[in-house]
From Swiss-Prot:
Keyword Transmembrane helix applies: no
Active site, per annotation: R227, H275
Originating organism: Escherichia coli (strain ATCC 8739 / DSM 1576 / NBRC 3972 / NCIMB 8545 / WDCM 00012 / Crooks)
Protein EC: 1.1.1.79, 1.1.1.81
Record-level Gene Ontology MF annotations: glyoxylate reductase (NADPH) activity; hydroxypyruvate reductase (NADH) activity; hydroxypyruvate reductase (NADPH) activity; NAD binding
Record-linked Gene3D superfamilies: NAD(P)-binding Rossmann-like Domain (3.40.50.720)
Subcellular location: Cytoplasm
Free-text function comment from the UniProt entry: Catalyzes the NADPH-dependent reduction of glyoxylate and hydroxypyruvate into glycolate and glycerate, respectively.
InterPro entries: D-isomer_DH_CS, D-isomer_DH_NAD-bd, GhrA_Enterobacterales, NAD(P)-bd_dom_sf
Similarity section: Belongs to the D-isomer specific 2-hydroxyacid dehydrogenase family. GhrA subfamily.
Protein known as: Glyoxylate/hydroxypyruvate reductase A
UniProt catalytic activity: glycolate + NADP(+) = glyoxylate + NADPH + H(+); (R)-glycerate + NAD(+) = 3-hydroxypyruvate + NADH + H(+); (R)-glycerate + NADP(+) = 3-hydroxypyruvate + NADPH + H(+)
CDD domains: GDH_like_2
Gene Ontology CC: one annotated term: cytosol
Amino acid sequence: MDIIFYHPTFDTQWWIEALRKAIPQARVRAWKSGDNDSADYALVWHPPVEMLAGRDLKAVFALGAGVDSILSKLQAHPEMLKPSVPLFRLEDTGMGEQMQEYAVSQVLHWFRRFDDYRIQQNSSHWQPLPEYHREDFTIGILGAGVLGSKVAQSLQTWRFPLRCWSRTRKSWPGVQSFAGREELSAFLSQCRVLINLLPNTPETVGIINQQLLEKLPDGAYLLNLARGVHVVEDDLLAALDSGKVKGAMLDVFNREPLPPESPLWQHPRVTITPHVAAITRPAEAVEYISRTIAQLEKGERVCGQVDRARGY
């Protein structure tokens, strides 16, 4: 069994050694331009077209929760990956836990009005504020996949009213489910906090725009943990300036790194982080990949395969 590995920033040698230890029967190598030798599996992140083109692979593993970097290249270079080759993403591998930590900490930050008190501190002003009440602090999760379900579970511990929206209806205990475009407005109408965990597909690009934001209650909050392309940044800034949106926590952006001239850096109602809400944990990723390869070799059914047509 031959495995090729490519990631522009990861510690390649660590990964190769870890994979060799986890899959002793495999010959694992770092892919370099010009390497056309045979391979059974490819582990990749933002791979060059030539790495995958023409290969008879058993499977490709994207080294993250999203596969948009591969699917976008496939649109321009359909020869990059044969339609018969299964494409897998890392469904969790510790990312769910990280998303839970990030989402819960920020929701509580807003719920306890720490954002308002920070503004008071900056102006040396002392004024206790009325508390928010849980029953009026509904949290909506936009995108109800694996990570969305993890976030919902963690927020249930804090007894917030929860709702989710996705392409198809979900049956999560204690979570009100909305499905399809026809139910999006009803979903948004009660969301004091909107958490975006949508996949990046042509249908979801720009979905968080002026029209969507206007359907939220006045003074709502936005937490974007998915992709920057989901948000029309000018529309969000306008909603923040008008007070329609009271605050935003953004981990992802249309351009990354976020350009120094972006007004998001200095906006008093925006907090940003550099795409770190959930990063790939190497040891857990290696365990998932080795387990999945073993299942594939036995012809067993496995989880995490991407539907290329849907984009996730």
